[in-house]
Amino acid sequence: MGLPWYRVHTVVLNDPGRLIAVHIMHTALVAGWAGSMALYELAVFDPSDPVLDPMWRQGMFILPFMTRLGIKESWGGWSITGESAVNPGLWSYEGVAGAHIVFSGLCFLSAIWHWVYWDLEIFSDPRTGKPSLDLPKIFGIHLFLSGVACFGFGAFHVTGLYGPGIWVSDPFGLTGRIQPVSPAWGAEGFDPFVPGGIASHHIAAGLLGIIAGLFHLSVRPPQRLYRGLRMGNIETVLSSSIAAVFFAAFIVAGTMWYGSATTPIELFGPTRYQWDQGYFQQEIDRRVRAGLTEKLSLSEAWSRIPEKLAFYDYIGNNPAKGGLFRAGAMDNGDGIAVGWLGHPIFRDKEGNELFVRRMPTFFETFPVVLVNKEGIVKADVPFRRSESKYSVEQVGVTVEFYGGELNGVSFSDPAIVKKYARRAQLGEIFELDRATLKSDGVFRSSPRGWFTFGHATFALLFFFGHIWHGARTLFRDIFAGIDPELDAQVEFGAFQKLGDPTTKRQVV
């Protein structure tokens, strides 16, 4: 049977046994990849600094998803939150990864069994003796079972009734931890940043799935609907399944890129919009002002800013700064963050405070411009010194650090001031170790960027796949050249033109 590579799936078109076999093998591959990839990430992951070198800076992809579901401890004796782990058992990173690999092996064996023993009695129609599947009934079974799983996840796992809960944090990603979540049944449940909506929506969707599944098990589709939607054709199942997958992929691409309670910044990194809107900068400023109203000095107020919060306010953690074809973790780009140098405050020779204009997301280079509180340019690093009027030297700009490692240190040397002005364009200033990983200094994206790109791309491809297979199943008769209203017996191969008795072949 000489099939081209893009037609090979036709071998399971009318073979339910082997259709099951290839799906079980696909599950084996998915589970095996997940378990193996988790073990690889655990082998290269460094849990020593959850503040300045979290999993998303190290390019971890599987670990954030495991963590948000309630796994936080390793057999290696560490916890994602920094504490030591004591005998975490099966519900640990290694335990769950190993369970996926064992499950993958069992699926592999069952796929082989179903491929060998494909002609099972359960698949044959007793009226015709030919293989046949009751697809509406199978749809009802799957809908019911997925509804039970969905309801169980929301009602037990997320709420902590029987399970650990999920990762919950504050709006600034500082206090994240695993905890049970109560369902949010009011309007707040529709806020994508409210964790309670995860529980309530899974409970509601699960109940809907259970009811819909029971409906499809007990009510047969009308004949006209059955024929109109080609419910007896396995390619209809393929088309609608692809639709469900691409729809889900588009949704999660959005929740990942724009942020939501399901994609906490402590596990996946900040979103680009938090940089664009100065989200963390405003919170830091609010905290400093609050400290000053408590009669703290500027140095004391800045020293109270958590290093974790300051680190979010750094452009190198913006997922939109990494190019799509720059492979590797963020740490391979600008380096491993070692410490916060502190917040630089620039002043002119009259003592007026100046603010460095920050680099927008989609710029690789940006002029160094210092403005006063009214937004008027007062100093810059000129491109042509011969025509400069606002150079650091001419304006007499100085810089002093508050908080961090350089707390209380000031510089008036123009070369040093310009160095820190350039770095202040990128947000809060951090000491970065580029030697350990031979980092090249070019920004990389976080797992948030990679996940979004991958899912948006495949959603688009699957959308076209849905259109393709939907058209094939709806217009199958046209593509095959058979008139669905044809009453006459059509013998394949008897006529040169199918169904046209005037072109009957000559018997030799």
UniProtKB/Swiss-Prot annotation:
Its main location: plastid. It holds the Pfam family PSII. Keywords: Chlorophyll, Chloroplast, Chromophore, Membrane, Photosynthesis, Photosystem II, Plastid, Thylakoid, Transmembrane, Transmembrane helix. It comes from the Eukaryota. One of its GO terms (cellular component) is photosystem II. PSII is composed of 1 copy each of membrane proteins PsbA, PsbB, PsbC, PsbD, PsbE, PsbF, PsbH, PsbI, PsbJ, PsbK, PsbL, PsbM, PsbT, PsbX, PsbY, PsbZ, Psb30/Ycf12, at least 3 peripheral proteins of the oxygen-evolving complex and a large number of cofactors. It forms dimeric complexes. This is Photosystem II CP47 reaction center protein. The lineage of its organism: Eukaryota, Viridiplantae, Streptophyta, Embryophyta, Tracheophyta.
